[in-house]
Amino acid sequence: MTRRRERRPKNTSRVFIYGAGKVGTSLARALRATGALVTLRAARKGLPRRIEADIVIVAVRDRDVRLVAESMRAAGIVPRRAVAVHVAGALDAEALAPLRGACAGVAQMHPMIAFASARRAPSLAKGHVRLQGDASAVRRARAVARRLGMVARELPGLDTIAYHAAAGLVANGAAALAAVGAELLVRGGVPRKVAPAMLGPLLRSVAENVASLGFPEALTGPVRRGDVAGLRKHLATLHAKLPEAVPLYLAAAAAQLPLARAIGDATEANLDAIAELLTKRA
């Protein structure tokens, strides 16, 4: 009796993810939720004997991407029909150049999302993905982004390092600002375990304002209002309770001034007074 070969549904993709860190694990979980057949392999286990996939995602540290590509090429394990992509923000598709000719194409597929924990994956829906590379690989990476509910962007001529620095400034800078803000809350009387829970929704509302309103309208607070007296009180309290945060506060307030001037809610005289206050306290 001849055994019939089981057919995959037409909309089912086979994905191999090499690297089971924060990004790799989060992508695996999200793709499985869409019905994709995902194999996740930790880099510490080394390369498998063979890979059966339509798309190979290399999710290792930036410095290891090219080495992994070279090793996969030498091992001959990437199917010729498959495409290979990496998720590094600071590297373009050329990091996977050793795999050209061994597969159907290579690309960068960087999700502009903050992956802080492998155990608690962030929401990917509506996040943006930067795609760059061979047309065949970009096409399949775009399909992956679509499955995840993400927005794919090719952005021709993009300065990759500037792009990555911008992402780091916002994602890492926001986390650092929140940590300083949490410490100030604690010194002001908020329980240490409560402070992050209070700041999370605040950050979420800022993110929503940035996405929906853009700049300069997303700015709120005393600089936008031209509240010189309020800023003086803030600085006095910071000097008393958390003096090491004063330079950070001054720098953040100075960065708000051009936005406040563009909005025009405050008088130029008040904004000039704020600029003078920040200069004197610096």
Set out the residue ranges of the language-model regions.
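NAD(P)+-binding Rossmann beta1-loop-alpha1 motif at the extreme N-terminus of oxidoreductases
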Residues: 1-52
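Internal alpha-helical scaffold of NAD(P)-dependent oxidoreductase catalytic cores
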Residues: 27, 99, 105, 120-212
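Rossmann-like NAD(P)(H) cofactor-binding subdomain of soluble oxidoreductases
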Residues: 45-120
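Interdomain hinge/lid region at the active-site interface
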Residues: 208-269
